[in-house]
Amino acid sequence: MNRYRTAEAFWQALEGRLRDLDPAKPLAQKRQLLAFERFLERVRQVRPGTILKGGLGLRLRDARARATRDVDILLTGDAEPDGAILITAGRLDLDEYFSFTVQFRRALIGTKGNQFHSKCTIGGKLFAEFDIDAAAPAPMVGEVSAIPGCDWLSFIGISRPTFDVYPLAAQIAEKLHALTVPRQTPNTRDKDLPDLAILARLSDGTPTAIIRAALEATFLHRATHAVPARVGGVPAEWAKPYGRLAGELGLEWRTFEDLQLAVRRFLDPVLSGEATGSWSVAEWRWR
């Protein structure tokens, strides 16, 4: 039970705790992550089986992954999520003073779903705000993982939540699809390449067949272009922002060239059909 009698007293205690936890990270970033998790816990209670994907799912798997500004979920049971579940979830009282409003923003492009905007408040005071991409389930290869969230509210007796996170193989396939989809304008998705390298680092022991099946299912479902034979070239303009990102996150691929090579060694053998066996992170090759 929340021992703080007012929302203001809780806010002050929470801010102090967040500042003490991992002082190197910006307070706003920690606020955002906590708001994400408290909202997702509400959605999970209203709609069990909701699957978390996207950047937040990757961040829960690996704390070194980049921060994200939105929540990306699959709402099981909804042919095309209309927001009713999210609005109901936002109103749940979980005895921690958080409250969420949810408003429709736009329909998602390329998938059945909608984007919503949420404001998280504590005692009527804005704590964080973010977008929610809520989509209906699509063909999915691989196993959903149960990943624990943050233990930041234990001081008021709230246990660490656990979330169902999108399969690694399916996320790899979607990242590659987004990276290679034909475009009429310059590709600005410069975060997809480092995300793929991090996903490779998390995929130790994954069989080639699982990655290949996920690629085939994703590209068939999206129906925009064929599975490529190789990763191919990426815009040279991505090198500068990657240099900053690598420094911020302490990524082991120090240069943009190192990053490209790492991703190609992971995916090109699968795309060409040469890879067999399973992925070895230690050797960074298929064996």
Question: Could you tell me what each predicted segment is?
Answer:
Residues 1-287:
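Compositionally biased terminal segments of proteins
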